[in-house]
Amino acid sequence: MLEQMGKAAREAAWQLAQLSTKQKNQALIRIADLLEQESAIILEANQLDMIQAREQGMSEALLDRLLLTPERLTAIAHDVRQVCGLSDPVGEVIDGSLLDSGLRLERRRVPLGVVGVIYEARPNVTIDVASLCLKTGNAVILRGGKETHNTNQATVKVIQQALEQSGLPAAAVQAIDKPDRELVIQLLKLDRYVDMLIPRGGAGLHKLCREQSTIPVITGGIGVCHTFVDESADFDKALTVITNAKVQRPSACNALETLLVHQKIAADFLPALSKYMEEQGVTLHASKSAMVFLKDGAAKVVDVTEADYRDEWLSLDMNVEIVSDMEQAIDHIRTYGTSHSDAILTQSLHNADYFVRQVDSAAVYVNASTRFTDGGQFGLGAEVAVSTQKLHSRGPMGLDALTTYKWIGYGEDLVRK
């Protein structure tokens, strides 16, 4: 089964690589239109997944990721149209030179070929990945989690219908329709056809892919994100940023999970924080030192554990730790962070510069919410993933991350001497 999918994807990728930007954009517009026209079918399938997920006791955080609403589907279709407006990187000449030999050399962007994506309870990934791959002339093989089986199948069917109506091969976007884990292992070994693999899910999935895949793997998306409030921070502004980072969408991988507070301001800042968090329904997981200032506050507070610092909450929970100085804050991030998104709230330019230099994460912020780590917010369009590694892409992966390059040499009957 996967062998046939791989062959079909490879053939489709060759055809996609020949398309003009106009042809690709026309197909994207058709996909967006059909997603809206067939929204009832997709939403009905999503409700089946939601019912099954609730029966199986899925957490509220994961249920939120799984849920599609008419508004969310409309927003997703809008994102597909936004991809049309993005510059097509395929064919771009990255650099070029005329060599002493007389050879005129260019380095030109080309599609990767076939991309494999394995993801869990995130039905929006199906459309985001398909649109970005199509724009960059790549075919894609999708393997969604069993939680999103009905939604994914309905969505891919609509996408394939739109592709065929646009004169493109349906095999450009394929989905593995069985939740069998053995098929995941088979996909990881499909290096004959698949050029890059992207897992989007928990630590277990990432570990499996790193250990079992014979295909280059881009890992990331696990976001234990930190914000450090230094002694010079403006309290009101800091509390606004913290609230946004934690509350706007707690199930997102760029949501704030651990707050680090300088000891010089803890006695005044933490009671104010407690009031803000109580209003938002956030439970605080406090260290022993932080508990002194939070135990009588408005927000619910419990003792933090070592494991809490290492895991994503993906919910209205937040760790709170007091640090003695900037160095301790940075050391905490190095110890427990996942190199995703980390921030400092400060009025000191010196402290901001030092933090930015010392924290080795894909995205580092000064006086801004970690929620900005997103392809759309970065102006990249819908993202295929957020990479926390350094090769071959880092941070939100937009269109450029789905390309490679080839060298092209022009000569006039030129021979090497």
Curated annotation (Swiss-Prot):
Record EC number: 1.2.1.41
**MF annotations from Gene Ontology:** glutamate-5-semialdehyde dehydrogenase activity; NADP binding
Which InterPro entries did the record assign? Ald_DH/histidinol_DH, Ald_DH_C, Ald_DH_N, Aldehyde_DH_dom, G-glutamylP_reductase_CS, Glu-5-SA_DH, GPR_dom
**What is this protein's record name?**
Gamma-glutamyl phosphate reductase
Question: PANTHER family of this UniProt entry?
Answer: DELTA-1-PYRROLINE-5-CARBOXYLATE SYNTHASE (PTHR11063:SF8), GLUTAMATE SEMIALDEHYDE DEHYDROGENASE (PTHR11063)
Question: Which protein family is named in the record?
Answer: Belongs to the gamma-glutamyl phosphate reductase family.
Tell me where in or outside the cell this protein is found.
Cytoplasm
The UniProt entry's GO CC annotations, sorted and at most eight, read: cytoplasm
Per the record, the GO terms for biological process are: L-proline biosynthetic process
The enzyme class is: oxidoreductase
Say if the entry is tagged with keyword Transport: no
Q: What CDD domains has UniProt attached to this entry?
A: ALDH_F18-19_ProA-GPR
* Function (record text): Catalyzes the NADPH-dependent reduction of L-glutamate 5-phosphate into L-glutamate 5-semialdehyde and phosphate. The product spontaneously undergoes cyclization to form 1-pyrroline-5-carboxylate.
Pathway-wise, it operates in: Amino-acid biosynthesis; L-proline biosynthesis; L-glutamate 5-semialdehyde from L-glutamate: step 2/2
Key words, A-Z: Amino-acid biosynthesis, Cytoplasm, NADP, Oxidoreductase, Proline biosynthesis
Quote the Gene3D superfamilies the UniProt record gives: Aldehyde Dehydrogenase, Chain A, domain 1, Aldehyde Dehydrogenase, Chain A, domain 2
Query: SUPFAM superfamilies under this entry?
Result: ALDH-like
- Catalyzes what? L-glutamate 5-semialdehyde + phosphate + NADP(+) = L-glutamyl 5-phosphate + NADPH + H(+)
Q: Is Cytoplasm one of the keywords UniProt gives this record?
A: yes
